[in-house]
Amino acid sequence: MNLTKQFFKYVSQNIFGLLGTSCYILADTYFISQAAGTDGVTLLNLCLPIYNFIFAIGSMIGLGAATRYAILRAQGEERAAQRYFSNAVFCACLLAVPFVLVGIFCPGTLLRLMGGDAGIVALGIPYARIFLLFTPFFMCNYIVSAFVRNDGAPSLAMVATLSGSLFNVVFDYIFMFPMGLGLAGAALATAVSPILSIAICSRHFFQKDNTVQFVRQLPSATLLGQSCQLGISGFVGEMSSGVTTTVFNFLLLGLAGNVAVAAYGVVANFALVATAIFNGVAQGAQPLVSRCYGQSDRAGARKLLILGSCTALALAAMLYAVVFGMTDTLVGWFNSENSAQMARFAHNGMRLYFVGYFFAGFNIVAAGYLSATNRPLEASVTSICRGVAAIVVCSLVMSALFGMNGVWAAFPASELLTALLTLFLLLRKKKQTV
């Protein structure tokens, strides 16, 4: 199979898998909006940064370790490559412990820190407690999926992710309504879904063509650090949504209160779907780019970067056409109380915010390419610019100048600035070895 066909095979399957992951958060939002109205949507939006942080750690360890594994295997360093999988699982479980402890002892305190008032905190404690207790499974799901994909089984990784997501959607409804568990039921369905995904992915480890081995060893900070170097773009890619959500939540609370945060909850949930599409392009291309890099195939790696960038631009155009043409319909799905104010806020937000994906798609693909070709410093600069520095500065400045419309427009502005920086970094290295 030629490189272009391999690219579209890996990317399409990874997009479908990650879309499934983001869609179960959409399902949560829809069912919670039906059960608890705008307060429920506000609660979920306050919890999204916590989800993002958990997913970001799993993504950083999983993608980074799997990238190291793919590069070393392409270079013939089989023994060194095998140490990364077991170390990633051990370290993820250790890093999950603080989240589990917070879930047991002080979920309410965490919700207050995220900006929840007394009513939101009381509503959200059961929800937060349950999903925090299952943090190890969320993190390990990223790791197992990344290694299965890098070991030549992207189809199985896609099936596993979609199966977990379908389970979540179906059991969201069953747990919340027929069984009457309310928000705790939504959290339980979300928490169990990665366990199913891990179980399906684990079939690969018993196949004849499996090359991933679980090595008995003590957790290694050195291996973890080497993994995180190449996984930092994945971390910041996930965290960018969390940072954006946290900053926007506090700005919108100050501008218009809980209704504005609920409106942003609608925007943020659709943004998760959009981000998943572009993460799918970057993560789908990563095994192929890493293999080209390990084999010193500079032309192949650059071809994949061009394919990824063009694919991201085409997807951004299709995405914005859907958002622009169906804005009121999309907002209406999550406005069970028919709040005219929330609908107005969310309508403006969707149309301004999603312009940013014309630039964000390129930034995500480029950061993934830099990580996959063992350029962690440049990947980190690009990712931190888009995920933290640019979005914080733009949102603070533009909200002060233009109010709520400034908050929505901060995302496209920050992604444009990051795209210019990323293009400079790529062109600066054009004459150097991949």
Language-model segments: which ranges?
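Transmembrane helix-bundle signature of multi-pass secondary active exporters and lipid flippases
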Residues: 14-63, 67, 131-138, 225-291, ...
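Helix-loop interface residues and adjacent transmembrane-helix termini in multi-pass membrane transporters
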Residues: 26, 35-38, 72-75, 150-151, ...
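Small-residue-rich hydrophobic transmembrane alpha-helices
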Residues: 41-101, 138-157, 263-327, 360-382
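Short runs within selected transmembrane alpha-helices of multi-pass transporters and secretion channels
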Residues: 62, 130-149, 157-165, 186-199, ...
